[in-house]
Swiss-Prot record:
Its main location: cytoplasm. This is Probable transcriptional regulatory protein Ctha_1786. The lineage of its organism: Bacteria, Pseudomonadati, Chlorobiota, Chlorobiia, Chlorobiales. The keyword Transmembrane helix does not apply. One of its GO terms (cellular component) is cytosol.
Amino acid sequence: MSGHSKWATIKRKKAATDQKRGKLFTKLVKEITISARMGGGDPDGNPRLRLAIENARANSMPAENIKRAVQRGTGEIDGANYEEISYEGYGPGGIAVIIEAATDNRNRTVAEVRHIMSRSGGSLGESGSVSWMFQRKGSISIAKSLASEEQLMELLLEAGLEDLKTDDEDYFSVLTDVKDLESAKKALEAAKIAYEDAKIDMIPDNTIELDGEDAEKALKMVDALEDNDDVQMVYTNMEISESALEKLNQ
């Protein structure tokens, strides 16, 4: 899930768990395949594919798996024909939820997503019902041990930096316009500053803080959505209260 400051570290730990469960490779393969199908198999001329391949390599995906995923996308070898679909709705406590999926059976996927949402007390809405509450941005995470705030500001202002978030304990979050993400990455690489990840993110204009039962239900809902094989990304505008975080860490 893409969420915010207080529990960003928890999400990173969860991502490592997702990898152990084998979920991450499935999602990465789908993203590579779709990117190659939409923009061609040459990463030099297809920024989305280049980003997908970089993320796959960063997560230790074998080169042969990456090659086959690209070839499925370009039609060189047979494979499932994935379709991209976005769903919008509301979760516990009235939080806004955007779900991005890649599926070869949209009827199956919408039924499964609706079931997960409804059993958590949420509901699917119409297209556009909550997406207006978010902005699509380029996002890069950089460990605070590798660079200072001043260093990043100076380096990235000419490379499309829109915001530099510092409220996570261990990481800076660089936000750019989507079209400037590649420029920001290249500036960091030229300065030999390693980044944890680079991605397209949906940033909420405002967040809703959840506590108690709502926080627990929302976290379970997001976990269930992310565990679904067809779901690629889940975005919400929730923030978890300090008391709920303490309980989560017990």
